[in-house]
From Swiss-Prot:
Transmembrane segments: none annotated. It comes from Mus musculus. The gene is Msh5. Pfam families: MutS_III, MutS_V. The keyword ATP-binding applies. This is MutS protein homolog 5.
Length: 833
């Protein structure tokens, strides 16, 4: 049986009550040694892995439970083709005992599961397929199931809100398929009671943690990183009616590298971007092709291949229509052009060096079956006539019977004119004219114009004719001659159409029998299209080939550039990076605002990413070591639906890095801690960095850009070779601050916030007051409140008092200074002091 239903609940058996920790039971005495003096060790139960998977709209959600460590592992939503190659790699790597999924699945997933189910009776045995109702995988019910779970790693003292915040830092709730897979897995575990089959029913399946799962050959990058590095960026399309989603690719890395000529090339490039890899053989094979097309003597070949690739169309959709017998005339045209373009690609690649694997694959796998398909279509299909009649028609000399019927059909109008003249001779003299017409499916009819006296239905009756119907003031009849024509000629149009449809079906069978070749053509052609696009971008932007070295841990870049910023700026200052050893694993970068710190962080991340997808990079030289993940905390991706503050989102991003980063990970942090009190933010930043530094050689490669100069001044980080302090070089020219955008050793002396405020257009009095308060804080002096209006009134009162003094005539004998002071000066004192 291909699929099994989920078994019923296991009856509760004897066992400890829930809530009593295992440590509360007395430890059993060790067993006595046997006669041989050797103690028998308890055999460890074999680990079981139970996988839950969902596939929808080209994306895959995966979660599995490992009984060896009682941990649930999940993989964020990942794109996967209908062939489900990614799912197959997951199955090969984790080798699950069971695969849990929804009973309501797509056709591609159903075929894949059917194939898996057929392996259950083979050796080695395949996984058990378990189908659960689709309601168990609902998004909301799955989310509530996750949030309401009883987990031993969450303290009972946590409130419901704190629990939600904690779980949101571990589980990507924005990945809908992953959340649904996790919810379905929890439902399956509670039904099967994995590991607690013999315990009381109130004892739940132990879950000791949630961990992110990444295939060994892939590099882990979350959606926040894709967004802040501008690897992908969607924006509104100006002509919304032209595109289904209303979105187009904005200024992004994908946007500037996507020069693919066929749709499937664009899909493959996006797939490569979502799956950066560590397989050196695969990466070098991509770079070999790019390097070949960058040679000046191969430019013409690259342009010719690009032209051929523009004719490679959506073959799978055409094959699907053929299977459903819904083929259009345009499908035959598209398939014909695609196959002939594929033959052109094959002939071109056979003249290229066969030492490059892609050229060898195209030369060998684009077999003569393609020529057979193209020859069949070209010899059978009459494209000009098919477009005119909007249906499938065949060329002459394919079927003699069809040709004969078409000749008769062509000569039919003149023949019918002669028949109509004979019919008119036998009609009433009041009928001025008639015609014999042919209507498919009905046959030959005599058409007579309606006369004025023909009002009632009884007036339509004519002796010797059978009335059929009235249409557009013309009466249609069957006569003896039209009946004879039906017998002699038959329904020519329908017969021709039926015979041509039969030929089309036979041609479809010939094409479908070679569908695997066409699918392989699409795979290799799209791969060639992507590499030609990357080569074109590398040529135009001056990229160089990266080198991969498993010996170094990190990256080394000489004169690297930001691939997007250099296109927007008139001049761009390159900077180098060296984090390829055990020294300087944590780089603290200080400098004024707008000095280029954030651009440098993104530059390091983008160059590393480009190397991991097999692209040339914007640098003079780049050496990439072992990188397993890229984490970022650069920009807060806010959303009302998340229900989290900006600072909480920042903390979640840092928590992902702290919980998952290894010694092979790249972590980019920009201005962490600015979303809360400066003291608390500084303390959190220092605590995170000290946590990583305490790992020693296992510390990830961390780049931190910060304006917290106290981090250095207060020596909050331990001194040692793991920490390296860098700054963006600047120069003060009078009151102006000149940015050199050059990274150098050292620490910034000041933040120069007043200069940045002036650039932003703040009024000068505000900037002056800010500098005054800053100086008072540094010197430890009290800050007095100030009011510009009060100060202006004081000046006016002082001026008025001075004017009174100037008007005094000190030589006047009647002047009494005591009266002047008591009446004029002393009352004004409170207004001027």
């Amino acid at each position: 049986m291909a699929f099994r239903a989920t078994p019923g609940r296991t009856p509760p058996g004897p066992g400890p009550r829930s809530g009593i920790p295992s440590a509360s039971f007395p430890s059993p005495q060790p067993p006595m040694a046997g006669p041989g003096g050797i103690e028998e060790e308890d055999e460890e139960e074999p680990a079981e892995i139970h996988l839950c998977v969902l596939w929808s709209s080209g994306y895959l959600g995966i979660a599995y439970y490992d009984t060896s460590d009682s941990t649930i592992h999940f993989m964020p939503d990942a794109p996967d083709h209908e062939s489900l190659k990614l799912l197959q790699r997951v199955l090969d790597e984790i080798n699950p005992q069971s695969v849990v999924t929804s009973a309501k699945q797509d056709e591609a997933m159903t075929r894949f599961l059917g194939k898996l189910a057929s392996e259950e009776h083979r050796e080695p045995k395949g996984p058990e397929i378990i189908l659960l109702p689709s309601v168990d995988f609902g998004p909301e019910i799955s989310k509530q199931r996750l949030l309401s779970g009883n987990y031993s790693f969450i303290s009972d003292s946590m409130t419901a809100t704190e629990k939600i915040l904690f779980l949101s830092s571990i589980i990507p709730f924005d990945c809908v398929l992953t959340v649904r897979a996790l919810g379905g897995l929890l439902k399956f575990l509670s039904r099967r009671r994995i590991g607690v089959e013999l315990e009381d029913y109130d004892v739940g399946v132990p879950i000791l943690g949630f961990k992110k799962f990444v295939l060994t050959h892939l590099v882990s990058i979350d959606q926040d990183t894709y967004s802040v590095l501008q690897i992908f960026k969607s924006e509104s399309h100006p002509s919304v009616y032209k595109v289904a989603s209303g979105l187009k690719e904005g200024l992004s890395l994908f946007g500037i590298l996507n020069r693919c000529r066929c749709k499937w090339g664009q899909k493959l490039l996006r797939l490569w971007f979502t799956r950066p890899t560590r397989e050196l053989r695969e990466l070098n094979s991509r770079l070999d092709v790019i390097q070949f097309f960058l040679m000046p003597q191969n430019l013409d070949m690259a342009q010719m291949l690009h032209r051929l690739l523009s004719h490679i169309k959506n073959v799978p959709l055409i094959l699907k229509r053929m299977k459903l017998s819904h083929t259009k005339v345009s499908d035959w045209q598209v398939l014909y052009k695609t196959v002939y373009s594929a033959l052109g690609l094959r002939d071109a690649c056979r003249s290229l060096p066969q030492s490059i694997q892609l050229f060898q694959d195209i030369a060998q796998e684009f077999s003569d079956d393609l020529h057979h398909i193209a020859s069949l279509i070209g010899k059978v299909v009459d494209f000009e006539e098919s477009l005119a009649e909007n249906r499938f028609t065949v060329l002459p000399n394919i079927d003699p019977d069809i040709d004969a019927k078409k000749r008769r059909l062509i000569g039919l109008p003149s023949f019918l004119t002669e028949v109509a003249q004979k019919e008119l001779e036998n009609l009433d003299s009041r009928i001025p004219s008639c015609s014999v017409i042919y209507i498919p499916l009905i046959g030959f009819l005599l058409s007579i114009p309606r006369l004025p006296f023909m009002v009632e239905a009884s007036d339509f009756e004519i002796e010797g004719l059978d009335f059929m119907f009235l249409s557009e003031d013309k009466l249609h009849y069957r006569s003896a001659r039209t009946k004879e024509l039906d017998t002699l000629l038959g329904d020519l149009h329908c017969e021709i159409r039926d015979q041509e449809t039969l030929l089309m079906y036979q041609l479809q069978c010939q094409v479908l029998a070679r569908a695997s070749v066409l699918t392989r053509v699409l795979d290799l052609a799209s791969r060639l299209d992507v590499l030609l696009a990357l080569a074109s971008a590398a040529r135009d932007y001056g990229y160089s080939r990266p080198h991969y070295s498993p010996c170094i841990h990190g990256v080394r870049i000489r004169n690297g550039r930001h691939p997007l910023m250099e296109l927007c700026a008139r001049t761009f200052v390159p900077n180098s990076t060296d984090c390829g050893g055990d020294q300087g694993r944590v780089k603290v970068i200080t400098g004024p605002n707008s000095s280029g710190k954030s651009i440098y962080l993104k530059q390091v991340g983008l160059i590393t990413f480009m190397a991991l997808v097999g692209s040339f990079v914007p640098a003079e030289e780049a050496e990439i070591g072992v990188i397993d993940a890229i984490f970022t905390r650069i920009h807060s991706c806010e959303s009302i639906s998340l229900g989290l503050s900006t600072f909480m989102i920042d903390l979640n991003q840092v928590a992902k890095a702290v919980n998952n980063a290894t010694e092979h990970s790249l972590v980019l942090i920009d201005e962490f801690g600015k979303g809360t009190n400066s003291v608390d933010g500084l303390a959190l930043l220092a605590a995170v960095l000290r946590h990583w530094l305490a790992l020693g050689p296992s510390c990830p490669h961390v780049f931190v850009a910060t304006n917290f100069l106290s981090l250095v001044q207060l020596q909050l980080l331990p001194q040692g070779p793991l920490v390296q302090y860098l700054t963006m070089e600047t120069c003060e020219d009078g009151e102006d601050l000149v940015f050199f955008y050059q990274l150098c050793q050292g620490v910034a002396s000041a933040s120069h916030a007043s200069h940045t405020a002036a650039q932003a257009g703040l009024p000068d009095p505000l900037i002056a007051r800010g500098k005054e308060v800053s100086d008072l804080i540094r010197s430890g002096k009290p800050i007095k409140a100030t009011n510009e209006l009060l100060r202006r009134n004081q000046m006016e009162n002082c001026q008025a008092l001075v004017d009174k003094f100037l008007k005094l005539d000190l030589e006047d004998p009647t002047l009494d200074l005591d009266i002047f002071i008591s009446q004029e000066v002393l009352p004004a004192a409170p207004t001027i002091l």
